[in-house]
């Protein structure tokens, strides 16, 4: 436990987590903003939100990418860092099981989808159809990094990415 605490005190894991999660959320949020119709269709594939009234699913398709971009900006700038890390942790805690459940629901629907790791699906992240297992691994890694950013006690690299700025 002491080694982890010493590593955290350097601020480097926090900086690493902020950069990786921040740029990932920025990239995927921008992808969704650039094609809201495709994002709406991928949300519909999950069958988690009611189709009626339509303003609910449409609102999520419009607002969620902007939340992701705002969280990315906060993580990268260090402004409201814990709030942004809480949001990204919460979003990943919802997205990851949803991707898993989508993958499970598609097993056996095509001859090539014999197991979860065979499934290729549009996860809704903005990158099109991707293999489910690597996406789950990526999301779990992002979730751990986001949790690190949330729980880190380091006082280094809490502001901007450039020391003394932000």
Question: What is each PLM-predicted segment?
Answer:
Residues 1-37, 55, 66, 73, ...:
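Extended, low-polarity transmembrane helix blocks
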Residues 34-60:
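Membrane-interface interhelical connector segments
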Residues 60-67:
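Short hydrophobic alpha-helical membrane-embedded segments
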């Amino acid at each position: 436990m002491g080694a982890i605490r010493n590593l955290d005190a350097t601020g480097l894991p926090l900086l690493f987590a902020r950069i990786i999660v921040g740029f990932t959320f920025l990239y995927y949020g921008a992808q969704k903003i650039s094609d809201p119709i495709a994002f709406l269709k991928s949300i519909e594939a999950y069958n988690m939100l009611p189709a009626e009234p339509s303003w609910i699913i449409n609102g999520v398709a419009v607002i969620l990418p902007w939340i992701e971009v705002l969280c990315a900006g906060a993580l990268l700038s260090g402004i409201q860092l814990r709030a942004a890390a809480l949001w990204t942790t919460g979003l990943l805690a919802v997205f990851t099981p949803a991707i898993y459940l989508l993958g499970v629901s598609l097993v056996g629907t095509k001859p090539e989808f014999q197991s979860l790791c065979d499934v290729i699906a549009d996860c809704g992240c903005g990158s099109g159809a991707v293999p489910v297992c690597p996406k789950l691994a990526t999301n779990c890694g992002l979730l751990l990094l986001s949790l690190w950013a949330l729980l880190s006690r380091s006082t280094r690299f809490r502001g901007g990415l450039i020391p003394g700025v932000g």
